């Protein structure tokens, strides 16, 4: 089941039950002809021993209590509905959508991880990737389609289809193709970015721009992308600081547009910031989150790949 690994990582007890997620009716069919394929981690001693043993026992008990206190900080009190990504921020919801949030539909958590600045091992934010409940059917339709499976995925006949898909999703070139084809169907996705330390809107905006420009196809689409990035910069209508544990939401809509929103945890209110209409911006951004040669967050990419395979 898709959420089992997620909830195990969030310390769900063996008694907790995970409710089933119903796949809703299909939105639109997947057409194989639209598939795109790229080109060619004595007693005195006994007394002394007894005292030593008692001391060690006492030390062990104290140490155990300290570890128990540390572990309590990571316990998720609502493990059926949330996932603990980082003990320093609020748990990520497993399901998210309206009316609390101004999204177009309901979403379920597909994978999560964190973003590090590698050269100084500096954690910047935690990242959650969600998929629209109504669009889950597109995952097996695309990744298990006869044409794509035969021509591109199931190349190792000694492995099962799931094993081949897993290998492809963890391959720098194949993952970009598979995720690209999934996004091209209009599959709605949502990214939740939660800073683990105080930052500001400019830093978040600049980070998104750099991520998009790092996409392998960015240079080949520079002119179109430039206008889209201008839209993205203008979408950040809110200025100033973004406190730790607030959220930036990026919703990839069915038509490829990207809706930017901000959740102020202190006020418990979500603000729509702006809309990016150029489809390449959202596609390149989510491609970088979910695959490609240099995924922005390797932990998130592996988590997404694992749960996509579980959906097949």
Curated annotation (Swiss-Prot):
SUPFAM superfamilies: Chalcone isomerase
Keyword Calcium recorded: no
InterPro entries membership: Chalcone_isomerase, Chalcone_isomerase_3-sand, Chalcone_isomerase_sf
Transit peptide: 1-48
GO cellular component: mitochondrion
Cell location: Mitochondrion
Keywords recorded for this protein, A-Z: Mitochondrion, Transit peptide
One MF term in the entry's GO annotations: intramolecular lyase activity
Primary location: mitochondrion
Protein family membership: Belongs to the AIM18/AIM46 family.
Protein name per Swiss-Prot or TrEMBL: Altered inheritance of mitochondria protein 18, mitochondrial
The gene coding this protein: AIM18
